[in-house]
Amino acid sequence: YIGAVLDRNGLRPSRYYLTHDDRVIMASEVGVVDVATDNVKEKGRLRPGKMFLVDFDKGELIDDEAIKTSFAGKNPYQDWLNEQQIHLSDLGCDTEAHGFDPDSLVHRLKAFGYSAETLQFMLLPLVNELRDPVGSMGNDSALACLSDQSRIIYDYFKQLFAQVTNPAIDSIREEVVMSLSCSIGPEGDLLQNKAENAHRLVIEHPILTNEEAAALKHCNHRGWTTKTIDITYDIDSNHNLSDMLDDICQQGSQAIKDGHSLIVLSDRNISENRGIISALLASSALHRHLIAKFERTQVGIILETGEAREVHHFCLLAGYGVDAVNPYLAFEALWQARRDNLIDFEDNGTVVVAYRKGVAKGMLKVMAKMGISTLASYKGAQIFEAVGLA
């Protein structure tokens, strides 16, 4: 056999000729090989997501529908999905989700590096305009590594963009091929077709509400259980950052050995006596550790953090291996803004809905800059450059 398949967006040209003397010619453009017009039996182009196969033994050309039909009928794949797939709505939770604690809000906002500008220029536009805030062309602020101000680790990373061989996508006009839906959790063996391979959790949006996060933290559904790892530390501890990251990684490996399907990294225990390890550092360290141990496909990584609040932050977390994020402190900051009449929403629930919509549009825009249309392809891709970090 020899064949070809075109990407689902149709961004790569592919044209073919079938001649009367039984030759098949395929190339990115017409005219690569000279063919007499009267010798052309059939010609066409490979369309988005379509396949093309030549069977040398039978001496025939197999079209896309025949290829897919032959494989689709081998197993009851739809039945497998209906029986095995898990959705967030399937997870019942008897534990009440964390609510709003206005008394400690200011202290926690300061601990996580929030500023008045963060709320005014980043969070409020996300919910009011339902999109990532847009500024004038150019960014003349100092690089994080050269700034006189204390900057969070996310500011040291710059997003890459598609160049030459990988064209960017218009995330608005090509919305039909863009998706933030993703399956997470233990993966089956790709070499074995069996129903258990479909036993995964489908998350439609990478930003989790507090209720969804609570359901995942206390998950006990059809064999799925969760291990929560605290990423805060005692400020009087003698352990250095490297030791604490190693401990998180070892706890992650042990969770897999104990049979857990999900790992939740949480910094909710922050207090005047407990500091925080950056959520980006902790999650990326665990992700890379599990890859090195060949264990990453056996578990999903969920992040419950007050650190992430901007679109860039969520893109970084996804790019370095996080499956979903619950930005609980961003929600609380916006709820307080609603109480202060800075935004006009009916209730806290509608604020969260608007925030998730704004973040979704922003993440799709960032993915589209790299020519990537699905979150599954963007996750763990590490398409960033670190400036000033060793």
Q: Model-derived features: where do they sit?
A:
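Conserved catalytic micro-motifs used in adenylation/nucleotidyl-transfer and phosphoryl/amide-
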Residues: 1-25
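Extended, highly charged accessory segments
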Residues: 5-7, 60-234, 239-247, 253, ...
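Glycine- and acidic
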Residues: 33-36, 135-143, 226-243, 262-274, ...
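Conserved structured catalytic cores and adjacent interaction surfaces
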Residues: 236-247, 255-313, 319-320
